[in-house]
Amino acid sequence: MNKQKNNRERTPQPEQDTERDEQLTNSHENDIDSAPAAEENDKVADPVEELTAQLAALNDTHLRLMAEYDNYRKRTLKEKSELIRNGGEKVLVDLLPVIDDFERALSNLGDMSEPAAIKGGVELIYSKFMDYLQKQGVKKIETADLPFDADLCDAVAMIPAPSAEQKGKVIDCVKTGYTLNDKVIRHAHVVVGE
């Protein structure tokens, strides 16, 4: 009996052989499967890298567009505020000749022997009108006895200066200049001493 037992242990059983064969086959298949899996991982890694690069490019484009939009928004807000601030410039420029007429009328009324009531009425109208313009941001450019400033004045004539101190200074203002919110809307026409 012992002999039979030993023989059984020595002779491989068909079940054990089958299990060994399956293990060998499985390990061999795993080796074969692992090679394509490594190739697939490389292929999968490439799309991941591509998608990462695309994501970075899209983020960069997005940030640039956001910055561009922010600059556009700031620029349009500035333009709108400038338009609101100086929007009535055309209307006010067209009213400036009326001021000129008032000034001429006042200077001529002083020379005439007209009743004082007419002169007082014209002065009142002129005063109210100038107050209105001042509220709108319109100011006269002061030129009398000041050095000539080409940014504010146009020299229409040059005459010999009556004194040495008046050389290069404004002698007379032919047409008054005006600014709207510190922007020149009409240059003063002046006579300069030389």
From Swiss-Prot:
Region (Disordered): 1-44
One Gene Ontology term of the molecular function aspect: protein-folding chaperone binding
Any one GO cellular component localisation term in the record: cytoplasm
Major localization listed first in the record, in broad terms: cytoplasm
Example GO BP: protein folding
Compartments, record wording: Cytoplasm
Keywords annotated in UniProt: Chaperone, Cytoplasm, Stress response
Biased composition range(s): Basic and acidic residues: 1-12
Stretches assigned to coiled coil: none
Annotated HAMAP family: GrpE
Function, in words: Participates actively in the response to hyperosmotic and heat shock by preventing the aggregation of stress-denatured proteins, in association with DnaK and GrpE. It is the nucleotide exchange factor for DnaK and may function as a thermosensor. Unfolded proteins bind initially to DnaJ; upon interaction with the DnaJ-bound protein, DnaK hydrolyzes its bound ATP, resulting in the formation of a stable complex. GrpE releases ADP from DnaK; ATP binding to DnaK triggers the release of the substrate protein, thus completing the reaction cycle.
Family according to the record: Belongs to the GrpE family.
Assembly behavior: Homodimer.
Annotated protein name in UniProt: Protein GrpE
Record organism: Porphyromonas gingivalis (strain ATCC 33277 / DSM 20709 / CIP 103683 / JCM 12257 / NCTC 11834 / 2561)
